[in-house]
Amino acid sequence: MLACASALSAPAATWVPSLDVITDKACYAPGQMVTFKVVGTMPANTNIRYRHGLAVVETAQLTSNSWTWTPPKVDYQGYMAELFTTAADGTETIVGTIAVDVSSQWTRFPRYGFVADFNDYNKTVDKNANIKTEMAYLNRLHINGVQFQDWQWMHHKPVKFNGDGSLTQWYQDISNRWVGVEYVKNYIAEQHKYGMKSIFYDLCFGAWKDAYKDGVKPEWALLKKDASGRFYQDYHGLPSSWASNIYLQNPKNEGWINYMKDRCDEVYNNFDFDGFQVDQLGDRGEVFDCDHNKVVLYKAYEPFLAAMKTAHPEKTLVMNAVSGFGTDSIVKDNVDFCYNEVWGNGNGYGGAAEQDFANLYDIIKKNDQCSNQQRHTVFAAYINYDKAGNDNRPDTKVNTPGVLLADAVMFALGGSHLEIGDHMLTREYFPAAPLQMDDDLKQRLVHYYDFLTAYQNLLRGTSLDQSELKAEVTTSAADVAITAWPPKAYTMTTFAKRIEDKDVVHFLNFTNTDDLSWRDVNGTRPAPALKTDIPVTVKVARPVGKLWVASPDIDGGAVKELSFKQNGSDLSFVLPSVEYWTMAVVEYKNVEDNTEDGVQTNEGIAWSVKDIIHPQKSSDANNSTIYNCYNLAGISVHSSNKGIHVGKGKRLL
């Protein structure tokens, strides 16, 4: 079959990133109004276009630096707002972009951040001003959940009370840092203003020394056995200058579970937290209960999580699967999304080595399978780890290429990255901030998180098992070798999914590196070699209607529709550019059999019921009004740009 090149629906756009655009919230409920604001001077005759993927939902002219928009009442959708001007010859110039997430539950598309400093240092810093600045940046990244690390007093007694039952306003955490209750609460309030959820952190089995004074029983302890056969309580050693080591309890012990349920009640009764981030310490080897029976530790997490969820079913519950330890038990029932702290020397997932980019795929694949394709993955992955721990490091900057390539791969695979708080996370001790982001990285992350949010339905709308596609992609370019996933040194790596009537092909740029680890431990990853005008041929399944690309590295993530040629199963086009990551989306035509008796659609491509289409004037692909068709109420589609048109006198079969 031979098809001609498609026509572009609009003149090519240029990119002038002159406007800083913000929204009033990180995410929105269906039907909730979005308020936009432009910081700076907006060009005359600026228009805004709201897209869901390629489809234009609405276009309007802007007459003020602040305006509102109400997205369609469809749950779990991402949109990109493009601000643009149009010259006399029809050329568009895009002057700003920002994403919008419409989701009733934040855990459907979690974008997780953190906070870990609750001190004003004897009033030497304006902590409340810092809180506002930090949360405004997280809001610009559409961070919809925030983990509170090391906010608590003691792990076994997170809330500290005075003798009269009132909250102690200042206390010291395990590292002897001061924590101000006022600032914990102000962080929560500021996050809620932006529609974010506030999640408190604690271990599932940790207690300080002398915890018996607070009601922790010796018979709850988790034990180990030394070479002589002597049993002793397992513990996590900490610096001698800290308040205590952490002594481990048996997480399935009913007494300990009930004790921690009471402590969680105290947390929720005194702080407006929205959930519990449960932590563990990975594989502890052979461990025992107080009767010297072996404890299968990863299985012991199940009753603990079940009890926490039953006690507070309305609250978010998340647990860390450290290097994959306990994944099967953790993600199956009670948690709301998958959270994986990944390192470089362990691997509880199988497949590639834990430090490799390829292992990120293995993690998501296993999480999808263990959660019955129901829960998405967040990586707690510490970039530039060795540089951050080196007192003789040459500089104190986070390496931008290391961050962007790691995020590109994580996002393309369908995950997200816990990395942003008041600093970039580079060590497992969240309060540590040895490396800082420069302004360029901060701005580039805005585009990356816009991209993650705007295209969330294509990136994270389905699991790998449901959508993974072994795309066949070739190029005639002499300076580019294209290979399929997993990444290979000095190549352009592709990863693909088939989602409904679209093939989504990600191009990830490894062309100038043989470092295939996401960790960039020493902060030495070089910037990629920008590749432009790459001739590409992709194998496709049927006639193609439209082709478009988008990248967080160019045009603020805005859509660029491309021309193409199709010869049978070969789709040929020119890929405009790949710096770190470019996404190409192939949209297939809908195949119909227009007979005298009825209209038929091929098996396997019919849309499923989700929302009702109410009668309205319909449009064809070129936005020209169609009057000789009926709209059918009661037929549901997945996104606002799709519809089913049946000619007069026809039947839908």
Predicted regions, residues:
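Aromatic-lined carbohydrate-binding/catalytic grooves of carbohydrate-active enzymes
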Residues: E134-E182, G206-K225, G237-G255, L281-N293
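Active-site-adjacent "subsite" loops/lids of carbohydrate-active enzymes
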Residues: S104-N128, F200-F271
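C-terminal outer-membrane/trafficking sorting elements
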Residues: N594-L653
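C-terminal beta-strand-rich structural cap/linker in extracellular carbohydrate-active enzymes
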Residues: N567-D593
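Carbohydrate-binding surface patches
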Residues: D479-R542, T582
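Active-site neighborhood of glycoside hydrolase catalytic domains
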Residues: K252-F337, W343-D362, Q369-N372
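An acidic-aromatic substrate-binding cleft motif
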Residues: I94-M154
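Aromatic/acidic polysaccharide-binding cleft in carbohydrate-active enzymes
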Residues: Q280, Q374-S463, T511
